[in-house]
Swiss-Prot record:
Native source species: Eriocheir sinensis (Chinese mitten crab)
Protein name, as recorded: Selenoprotein M
Signal peptide interval: 1-19
PANTHER family according to UniProt: SELENOPROTEIN F, SELENOPROTEIN M
Gene name, Swiss-Prot/TrEMBL: Selenom
Record-level Gene Ontology MF annotations: oxidoreductase activity
Amino acid sequence: MARGLAVFFLLAGACLALAEDVVDKGVAKARVESCSGUQLNRYPGAKQFIQEDLPLFHNTKFQHIGGAAPELLLLNKQDQELERFDLKKLSREEINELMIKKGFYKKSSKDEQVPEEYQEGPYMEKEEL
């Protein structure tokens, strides 16, 4: 009985390990989470990025979370979180550079068409800008 139980837990552990490996690790979209009021006002670089630059990036969105400090979440196609970045100490330029380094396309205007290679992820990280 004890041996059968040990085998069961061993197999269950192996299945869980395999399930974790199935997660798609390709960055396909990004979400910035933050409050849109007083908390965000403390971080002018993040506030400017969210208001002026985020709408120009393809496959990105803003999610209001009351009282939350600004964070960038990189997600796969299933909306699973792959990476999280604290934006509090970053300037607007640094956040833009981070997005571009992570492979996201920034349009020069809202009307600009997104090139074919940027339509869908996964996006590849760039070594140099």
